Amino acid sequence: MKDIKARKQVEKSGAACFDRAFGSKGRGKNLMSSSIETIKSSLCKAGLRLLAEGLVARTWGNISIRIDERRMAVTPSGIMYEDILPEHIAVMDIITGRWESTVRPSGEKKLHAAIYRERPDVGAIVHTHQMNASVCAAARVDVEVNDRAAADILRASKIYCSGYGRPGTGKLTKETVSVLKGGMCALMANHGAVCLGKDIDEAFTVSRILENVCGTFLAEKISAASPSAVMTAENICRIYLHIRASGARS
């Protein structure tokens, strides 16, 4: 009887987390097995989406989806996204770190697990090497979010950059988790960005908005640093008069 009750509790917990990620329509009689297979399939598709949206190259980056309160599914290490199959997706206990898969899971699995432990509101995580965010991360700068709509989605008025930690290390995990501060993304010093969401679609939305915010930030910094590059009204007028005098037409 105790085993039956325990199993029902796990299934109930899994249903709630699965609903957050995919909606209650995805639930069936064989919840645990069907939800895990659905999640694995979703991760395979998400990997192709990473490439299509220019967020990573080759085998860079990684993605995970929460299965339930204790488990997550995460992409493998060292396999091209075009070649990832459902059996390559690891199921990992976010408390013990134990995992099951035919291949090694991502080297950043501990980072994903730590975020899920700290943030019960998070259902999916995407680690990217997107251009603008990676430039800001390499410069190790915090990025102001001046667009209110973007700030609402990112849940932050400033995107913080973590201290440096080598890939796959406890230091990287600790530094990254410490700067999330309840927000939906963070920059990882010299290592790209991490974007969160209640589901995989929201995590991708966060990554796109982060890229736009970082692009605006960089453009403003470049403009401020190069005032001489801005054309003065006098020079614009002189160019106009020169073109007019030469008889040239646009």
Label for each model-derived stretch:
Residues 27-250:
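Glycine-rich flexible loops
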Residues 14, 23-28:
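Residue-identity detector for glycine
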Residues 9, 13:
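Cationic, low-complexity basic patches in intrinsically disordered or flexible, solvent-exposed regions
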